[in-house]
Regions:
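Carbohydrate-interacting regions of secretory-pathway proteins
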Residues: 22-443
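Bacterial N-terminal signal peptides
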Residues: 6-17
């Protein structure tokens, strides 16, 4: 028994070093479509000298006898990508590769545009490159904003790069999974469950119909896989699944500037010392109970943020918060309690429809077991409100949904509820009619 307990303890420690959602293969949420059949190149178009299907995977290969004179690409012919989530696995034996999206075909099998980097180089794999355009864009670990003049500024971190390398976020010469999310001008990369970069691209939008116009942001384009010119190489891809997202999505807004609480209001004077800013994050002591809310109202949007449990206990993110400020305002609470992220609490009878089999009174449990990261690590919280529909994702796993939510402008609030939390990288991407009217681009 003692040996068994020791083994379980060691296993638990090891599992705590990886994102909980990835200890096992996470389920694919509804709406994903496989775009590679695992049998042949149907729907894909690349130079047959280099691209083929072998053992159920797309294989790109160059040899000393058969090199490529320049970068060459295998293009998905199923249409163009605008707003989407892409999940794709890759294995690189040697050389350099990439996954192109919102890209342009400049010539036959020659592509330019956003590229998720693929190379056997921890600390580099996961960054964002602009092939045939603006070049290197966002380093691993960075949250970048590009302004209207094309000037780049790192405004925060999605994860510490050195810590990613230490954790082994990349599996050298083995299978890895990218998740690439593009909504409006907000782009995110995840590798094996870890966030590797975020970008708000406020650069001028290029003409999607002009292959030569590549020095700017791209809102749509093709998907392709790269073989890089150079020494002989082998790269493989499989399990390619795409989910098209309903928009339109507007310009992303940073609700928290990383420096002060401009744009935020404590619910009462008693909370003035509860919330603060330190090292680019919003700190929350948890006491007294209450919340910090936005000064502005929002209706339909994606809210993307990172939340850290400094101590175990309760908190939450309130959306469509309406009425007078009080400890429990009428709203939808996206739970922030330790091991309960993804749960829904209905506060003050907010009109909405939830899954009856997971609901007890005002509380709707999440769909899957907890998938939060270890205490003291950042969790990615993604809350979508589009009209009456609500979706809550924790570390890229869809954990809860609701329908027929009352469509009303409301505040967004961060709760103080007895435990210490931190919040950062709070980004709002407006949806639908609100997308055309939403405010200043992110600074």
């Amino acid at each position: 028994m003692r040996l068994t307990l020791l083994g379980l303890t060691v296993a638990a420690v090891l599992l705590s070093q990886v994102p909980a959602a990835w200890a096992e293969e996470p389920p694919l949420e509804p709406g994903f479509v496989s775009i590679f059949n695992g049998k042949d190149m149907d729907g894909w178009d690349g130079n047959p000298d280099f691209w083929s299907v072998k053992d159920g995977v797309i294989r790109g290969e160059t040899t000393a006898e058969k090199p490529t004179k320049g970068n060459t690409f295998c293009v998905w012919r199923g249409g163009t990508l605008k707003d989407f989530i892409l999940r794709i696995k890759f294995r690189l034996q040697n050389g350099n590769s990439g996954i192109q999206y919102r890209s342009k075909e400049m010539d036959k099998w020659r592509v330019g545009g956003y590229q998720a980097e693929v190379e056997n180089a921890p600390g580099k794999v996961g960054f964002l490159y602009h092939e045939g355009g603006r070049g290197w864009l966002v380093n691993v670990g960075d949250f970048m904003v590009i302004d209207e003049k094309g000037e780049k500024k790192v405004v925060g971190k999605v994860w510490d790069k050195d810590d990613l390398v230490k954790r082994g976020y990349y599996n050298n010469k083995d299978w890895n999974e990218y998740i690439i999310i593009a909504r409006g001008n907000f782009i995110q990369h995840y590798l094996n469950g870890y966030p590797t970069m975020s970008l708000i691209d406020n650069d001028r939008v290029t003409d999607p119909k002009d292959p030569a116009d590549r020095k700017g942001a791209a809102m749509e384009g093709i998907l392709a896989l790269q073989i890089h010119a150079g020494p002989p190489m082998v790269v493989e891809f499989k399990d390619i699944c795409l989910k098209t997202l309903e928009g339109p999505f507007g310009k992303a807004v940073r609700l928290f500037n990383g420096e002060n609480l401009d744009g935020w209001v404590p619910a009462s004077d008693a909370l003035k010392e509860t919330f603060g800013v330190k090292d680019g994050v919003i700190t929350d002591t948890g006491k007294p109970a209450g919340y910090l809310r936005t000064a502005d109202d929002f209706t339909s949007y994606v809210l993307s943020l990172q939340l850290k449990h400094v101590t175990g206990g309760n908190s939450g993110v309130l959306v469509r918060c309406v009425g007078p400020d009080k400890v429990w305002p009428k709203s939808i609470e996206c739970q922030g309690q330790t091991n309960a992220m993804g749960d829904i609490w209905n506060i003050d009878k907010f009109p909405m429809k939830v899954a009856e089999d997971r609901t007890n009174d005002r509380h709707t449990r999440k769909m899957h077991p907890p998938n939060e990261r270890a205490m003291g690590e950042w969790n990615d919280y993604d809350i979508l409100l589009n009209g009456g529909d609500l979706q809550i994702r924790v570390n890229n796993l869809l954990q809860n949904t609701a329908t027929e939510c009352e469509v009303v402008p409301g505040k967004i609030a961060l709760q103080a509820e007895g435990s210490q939390k931190e919040f950062r990288n709070i980004v709002l991407v407006p949806i639908g009619a609100e997308a055309a009217a939403k405010p200043e681009p992110a600074k």
